């Protein structure tokens, strides 16, 4: 991993699906540059494992168990992350699920709704919370973390 690419000390990033794969890789990259990181995932054990990895980089890290397809859960988890970190400067809506059916034409409506709930609606719910937070910060004179 590249070191000293740029300094993100004092910045906070929120990453959904941050407990594995691309999301954890993004979290590691940001933390390695001094960024505080809040990760969200649906599996508490995977969240704990990811936190153990992220803590080695030094900045404050946190995790929330969150189903991004639930707008109330997203709002609650965003508030919890803000309570821990005080702000969010960057938001990465990385959480995603695939279909469980072996073929598209065998997919049930419930399965389709689950996929759309996470992969589409979840992105909207997360970015809506982030945008509201960032807009509020900008209106109070803290535009773009400056």
Model segments located where?
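Conserved glycine-rich cofactor-binding loop
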Residues: 12, 19-21, 43
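A short, exposed helix-loop element centered on a Lys and neighboring polar residues
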Residues: 127-128
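Conserved NAD(P)H cofactor-binding loop of Rossmann-fold oxidoreductase domains
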Residues: 94-100
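The beta1-alpha1 cofactor-binding region of Rossmann-like NAD(H)/NADP(H)-dependent oxidoreductases
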Residues: 44, 65-77, 109
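Conserved glycine-rich Rossmann-like NAD(P)H-binding loop of the short-chain dehydrogenase/reductase
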Residues: 33-49
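Active-site loop of short-chain dehydrogenase/reductase
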Residues: 11, 60, 87-88, 134-146
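Substrate-binding pocket helix/loop in short-chain dehydrogenase/reductase
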Residues: 102-104, 111-116
């Amino acid at each position: 991993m590249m070191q000293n690419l740029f300094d993100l000390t004092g910045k906070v990033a929120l990453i959904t699906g941050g407990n594995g794969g691309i999301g954890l890789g993004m979290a590691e990259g940001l933390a390695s540059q001094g960024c505080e990181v809040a990760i969200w995932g649906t599996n508490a054990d995977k969240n704990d494992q990811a936190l153990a990895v992220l803590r080695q980089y030094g900045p404050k890290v946190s995790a929330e168990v969150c189903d991004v397809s639930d707008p109330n859960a997203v709002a609650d988890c965003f508030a919890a992350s803000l309570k821990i970190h005080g702000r969010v400067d960057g938001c990465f809506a990385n959480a995603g699920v695939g279909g469980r059916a072996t073929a598209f034409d065998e997919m049930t409506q419930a399965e389709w709704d689950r996929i759309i709930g996470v992969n589409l609606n979840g992105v909207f719910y997360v970015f809506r919370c982030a945008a509201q937070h960032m807009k509020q910060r900008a209106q109070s004179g803290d535009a773009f973390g400056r």
